[in-house]
Amino acid sequence: MKIGILSRNQDLYSTRRLIEAAESRGHEVKVIDALRCYMNINSEKPQIHFKGEELINYDAIIPRIGASVTFYGTAVLRQFEMMNVYPVNESVAITRSRDKLRSMQLLSRKGIGMPITGFASKPDDVKDLLDMVGGGPVVIKLLEGTQGIGVVLAETRKAAESVVEAFMGLKANIMVQEFIKEAGGADIRCFVIGGKVIAAMKRQGAEGEFRSNLHRGGSASLVKLTPEERKTAVAAANIMGLNVAGVDLLRSDRGPLVMEVNSSPGLEGIEAATGKDVAGLIVDFIEKNAATKGTKTRGKG
């Protein structure tokens, strides 16, 4: 098969591993920087050009689109879909999951466990909003943040009011969530491929750090999932319509709570913690599914 990887840097661990996995199975692979693609959008023969050449005869595309280039990256992916190239994750599923608020609303509609989450536009509503999520401590998140950037723990109500008002003053969109103390600064990353959890790791925040992101110095270890955690992770990925997803859960007194559903989960941490060939499993999934050559929008909203 001829497989394209939408990635801006072929030296990244995840991109390198996907190239290795595909080539070792006899596939032809090309890394394509979405920002260097330009498109001919027409109803006869839609085209994508990359650095002067037309991209043709691709069987599948693996999107590894960074958060900062979501808009253009998903436009390029959508064009591949118009050309009948099989996407590992569809453009609509990626945009759905990238919008933190929209994804929380979709999960809540299906009754998936999550931290109580508040969203407001005006500083006048901050006091009511904090009452809604249970006062302090609360976690305040920038809707556009990634890798733990733009996430603040406000230990007291007073601190929460100050932080929310400061963000609002910058015209930033934020959501306010209850702090799950019993999680102890740890979360669980479940790696879902094709409706199954194929690997999971526990990420523990560094000393004195409530964020467990590995980019923030957290550590990863193997974890055994409960049946409920497994079911929750698969359901969250399905609601987003993602074939490949990293679902982040917190262990709480009321069961697993979904923090985020990531459409472009990194491979380095999960492969190191579990010893599994996750890149190979993604390519296996493509081999089984790309032959249908169809894209079908899954999930709703």
UniProtKB/Swiss-Prot annotation:
<dbReference type="InterPro" id="IPR013815">
    <property type="entry name" value="ATP_grasp_subdomain_1"/>
</dbReference>
<feature type="binding site">
    <location>
        <begin position="178"/>
        <end position="179"/>
    </location>
    <ligand>
        <name>ATP</name>
    </ligand>
</feature>
<feature type="binding site">
    <location>
        <position position="260"/>
    </location>
    <ligand>
        <name>Mn(2+) 2</name>
    </ligand>
</feature>
<feature type="binding site">
    <location>
        <position position="260"/>
    </location>
    <ligand>
        <name>Mg(2+) 2</name>
    </ligand>
</feature>
<dbReference type="InterPro" id="IPR004666">
    <property type="entry name" value="Rp_bS6_RimK/Lys_biosynth_LsyX"/>
</dbReference>
<dbReference type="Pfam" id="PF18030">
    <property type="entry name" value="Rimk_N"/>
</dbReference>
<keyword id="KW-0460">Magnesium</keyword>
<dbReference type="InterPro" id="IPR023533">
    <property type="entry name" value="RimK"/>
</dbReference>
<dbReference type="InterPro" id="IPR011761">
    <property type="entry name" value="ATP-grasp"/>
</dbReference>
<dbReference type="GO" id="GO:0046872">
    <property type="term" value="F:metal ion binding"/>
</dbReference>
<dbReference type="GO" id="GO:0009432">
    <property type="term" value="P:SOS response"/>
</dbReference>
<dbReference type="InterPro" id="IPR013651">
    <property type="entry name" value="ATP-grasp_RimK-type"/>
</dbReference>
<keyword id="KW-0436">Ligase</keyword>
<keyword id="KW-0464">Manganese</keyword>
<feature type="binding site">
    <location>
        <position position="248"/>
    </location>
    <ligand>
        <name>Mn(2+) 1</name>
    </ligand>
</feature>
<comment type="similarity">
    <text>Belongs to the RimK family.</text>
</comment>
<dbReference type="InterPro" id="IPR041107">
    <property type="entry name" value="Rimk_N"/>
</dbReference>
<feature type="binding site">
    <location>
        <position position="262"/>
    </location>
    <ligand>
        <name>Mn(2+) 2</name>
    </ligand>
</feature>
<keyword id="KW-0648">Protein biosynthesis</keyword>
<feature type="binding site">
    <location>
        <position position="262"/>
    </location>
    <ligand>
        <name>Mg(2+) 2</name>
    </ligand>
</feature>
<feature type="binding site">
    <location>
        <position position="260"/>
    </location>
    <ligand>
        <name>Mn(2+) 1</name>
    </ligand>
</feature>
<keyword id="KW-0479">Metal-binding</keyword>
<keyword id="KW-0067">ATP-binding</keyword>
<dbReference type="GO" id="GO:0005737">
    <property type="term" value="C:cytoplasm"/>
</dbReference>
<dbReference type="GO" id="GO:0036211">
    <property type="term" value="P:protein modification process"/>
</dbReference>
<dbReference type="Pfam" id="PF08443">
    <property type="entry name" value="RimK"/>
</dbReference>
<keyword id="KW-0547">Nucleotide-binding</keyword>
<protein>
    <recommendedName>
        <fullName>Probable alpha-L-glutamate ligase</fullName>
        <ecNumber>6.3.2.-</ecNumber>
    </recommendedName>
</protein>
<feature type="binding site">
    <location>
        <position position="260"/>
    </location>
    <ligand>
        <name>Mg(2+) 1</name>
    </ligand>
</feature>
<feature type="binding site">
    <location>
        <position position="141"/>
    </location>
    <ligand>
        <name>ATP</name>
    </ligand>
</feature>
<feature type="domain" description="ATP-grasp">
    <location>
        <begin position="104"/>
        <end position="287"/>
    </location>
</feature>
<dbReference type="GO" id="GO:0018169">
    <property type="term" value="F:ribosomal S6-glutamic acid ligase activity"/>
</dbReference>
<dbReference type="GO" id="GO:0005524">
    <property type="term" value="F:ATP binding"/>
</dbReference>
<feature type="binding site">
    <location>
        <position position="248"/>
    </location>
    <ligand>
        <name>Mg(2+) 1</name>
    </ligand>
</feature>
<feature type="binding site">
    <location>
        <position position="187"/>
    </location>
    <ligand>
        <name>ATP</name>
    </ligand>
</feature>
<feature type="binding site">
    <location>
        <begin position="211"/>
        <end position="213"/>
    </location>
    <ligand>
        <name>ATP</name>
    </ligand>
</feature>
<dbReference type="GO" id="GO:0006412">
    <property type="term" value="P:translation"/>
</dbReference>
